[in-house]
Amino acid sequence: MPVANSKSTTKATKLVELLRDKRSLLIVMQDNPDPDSIAAAAALRRIANTLTDVHCSIAYGGVIGRSENRAVAGYLGLNFRSIEEIDLEKYDAVALVDTQPRAGNNSLPEERQPDIVLDHHPLRAETRAAPFSDVRKRYGAVSTILVEYLGELGISPDPPLATALLYAIRSDTQDLGTEAVQADIDAAEALYPLANTRMLSAIQRGRVPRSYYTALAKALENARVYGKCIIADLGDVDNPDMMGEMADLFLRHEGIEWVLCHGAHDGKLLLSMRTSQSRKRAGDVMKRIVSRIGTGGGHATAAGGQVPLKKGTRAEREGRHKTFRDRLLREVGGTNGRGRRLLGSA
């Protein structure tokens, strides 16, 4: 499965050299991991298990909530563990995948410096301290980096891993659309003959629980339209991935260019943003929306953020909602005021 890239040749070799000096590796994904995090972590584990004697564990914070994400994790057949169950002292190396130190979207304690950082979001200053890092913000998916590593190291992924990697790249690039670069397309083409296309289709049509429809009903009820923007407060959510799912859905509305969904989970307000236009990067807009009150970032058309709740009162949450709304509309030029309900006439 050759996928040529001179940078990956050098990086893959250095990665293996580092791992050969370690006994145990903890691979930490972003909180509430998506298919890109899951597949990339599995690929890093495959590299470590194939070429070194290092023992690997994969951990995450939050939950694996979205049906497609659960399907990918289940198909890989690996033991993905909550980081709360992990004794970090038992691992002499830690890797961050699809996230970076102090990015606000992973549960690795700040005092623990990662040895390896693999990501495709803008480089953070803290990442420079890692002995090994490969951050390519132009890439649509971190899985693309791992596919290049596999190719350079002569490792052919089995059907479950190839399927997970292919789905991850397609998912994170909007099916090889505006977020994709040539490297993502090349990686997807290399994976396709190795993937289980029947399973790929099954992942995309994953079953959802009744709670999904409850959350959907609440999102529809609370969504308000401000010109070319939709903003929706989902209230309390059990599944943090619901914000992203609803944002994807609302962006399909005719004439809508920006969507912001937020909801409360585990003492924080989680935000998800989508846009169909390219005048401003969603990741940059999200950073400004949560400036001085939380953390956030992302890519050109998709972004996420989180803001801690100090009291969790209704007044605090309504105040944050107003802040999010006002800042977004100031950024993208939507109609201010109360807006109008997506459903109904008020």
Where are these regions (language model features)?
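A structured phosphate/pyrophosphate-recognition subdomain
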Residues: 2-32, 42-49, 125-268, 301-302, ...
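Short, basic, glycine/proline-bearing loop/turn elements
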Residues: 69-71, 88-91, 228-236
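Primary mode marks residue(s) on the alpha4-beta5-alpha5 output face of response regulator receiver
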Residues: 273-274
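Low-complexity, glycine/alanine/valine/leucine- and proline-rich hydrophobic stretches
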Residues: 279-296
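Active-site cofactor/cluster-binding pocket
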Residues: 71-132
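Anionic-ligand anchoring segments at beta-strand to alpha-helix junctions in alpha/beta enzyme folds, i.e.
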Residues: 22-88
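Residues at the starts of beta-strands that form the adenosine-phosphate
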Residues: 24, 55-57, 93, 114, ...
